């Protein structure tokens, strides 16, 4: 999950926790990675022409997601895009977004009708939570006229004007991870901290 505090609220994050709890009851244990996206996202808005900021934002999200996936040993990424539903979900847009990763991208909802997607959400009891009116980091920075058919060469040119590597590293370092069991309980909070403490302990023991 990508959040951009203070532009996104604590209620918006709680909504994600509530959705994760519901999903864990359906699919079992879930690991939730919360990415603090504020600094990188605000720089995208400053540096990229407004009608291309949505495309660029999605591209950077995918870059971050790919790094997390590699750390976790995942072989693919999965998104909830449905073709034609919003500006960022056209074939042209997906082509531009896909370009930043070599990982397979699974889109199980791609050709599903909105009515069918809503039915699934009702069945697994996530629809009501999803409809809560808390803005996410995509909606708060939505441009007035997002490009529905972006051109790859243009977005590559816009992003190549600046070096984002330091911002990407900072964003990756900001990630907090939570593990939910099949009953929706948090069984490990901020795994990154626990892992670092364990590594510190191991390093110290080597000195004994």
Locate the predicted segments by residue.
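ATP-dependent adenylation/nucleotidyltransferase module used to activate substrates
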Residues: 1-123
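Peripheral terminal appendages
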Residues: 30, 74, 90, 94-103, ...
């Amino acid at each position: 999950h990508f959040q951009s505090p203070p532009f996104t609220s604590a209620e918006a994050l709680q909504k994600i926790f509530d959705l994760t709890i519901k999903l864990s009851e359906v699919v079992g244990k879930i690991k939730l990675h919360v990415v603090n996206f504020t600094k990188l996202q605000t720089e995208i808005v400053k540096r990229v022409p407004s009608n291309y900021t949505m495309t660029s934002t999605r591209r950077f999200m995918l870059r971050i997601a790919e790094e997390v996936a590699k750390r976790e040993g995942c072989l693919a990424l999965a998104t909830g895009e449905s073709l034609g539903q919003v500006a960022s979900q056209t074939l042209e847009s997906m082509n531009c977004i896909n370009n930043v990763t070599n990982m397979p991208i699974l889109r199980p909802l791609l050709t599903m009708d909105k009515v069918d997607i809503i039915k699934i959400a009702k069945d697994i009891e996530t629809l009501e939570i999803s409809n809560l009116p808390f803005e996410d980091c995509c909606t708060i920075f939505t441009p007035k006229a997002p490009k529905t058919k972006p051109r790859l060469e243009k977005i590559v040119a816009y992003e190549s004007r600046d070096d984002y590597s330091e911002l990407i590293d900072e964003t990756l370092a900001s990630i907090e991870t939570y593990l939910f069991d099949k009953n929706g309980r948090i069984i490990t909070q901020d795994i990154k901290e626990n892992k670092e403490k364990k590594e510190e302990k191991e390093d110290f023991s080597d000195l004994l």
